[in-house]
């Protein structure tokens, strides 16, 4: 799995646990076992998200300059910054996730997920018949 996928899963799990169908922040009412597994998975991917933010900030400092009291990447360094960030996001990592059964997935309602998020959910967080 790439770090970029872990970041996308972080965003999706956050949506599932803490937003309603209109995107408002709420703690969703989910069965204990579903919430438990998703929270365990969130613990895994949140570490990747924190490292990503740390790396992104480091790269902004390296390839940026202070402008109006805020660090921003300079125009002449923008392509290098993007390349370095993409290299980092393409880094392979290995995680063992708590997967959900089809029945458990059925308890998750009204989540606005992007197609790529759903693909990652299916690949990494759902149990297939082979897993059972």
Predicted regions and their residues:
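A composition-driven surface/loop motif
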Residues: 1-132
């Amino acid at each position: 799995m790439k770090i970029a996928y872990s970041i996308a899963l972080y965003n999706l799990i956050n949506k599932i646990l803490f937003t309603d169908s209109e995107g408002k922040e709420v703690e969703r009412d989910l069965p204990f076992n579903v919430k438990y597994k998703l929270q365990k998975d969130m613990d895994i991917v949140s570490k990747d998200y924190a490292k990503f933010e740390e790396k992104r900030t480091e790269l902004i400092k390296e390839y940026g300059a202070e402008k109006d009291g805020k660090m921003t990447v300079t125009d002449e360094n923008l392509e290098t910054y993007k390349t370095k960030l993409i290299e980092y996001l393409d880094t392979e990592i290995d995680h063992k996730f708590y997967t959900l059964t089809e029945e458990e997935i059925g308890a998750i309602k009204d989540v606005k997920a992007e197609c790529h998020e759903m693909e990652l959910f299916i690949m990494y967080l759902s149990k297939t018949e082979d897993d059972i």
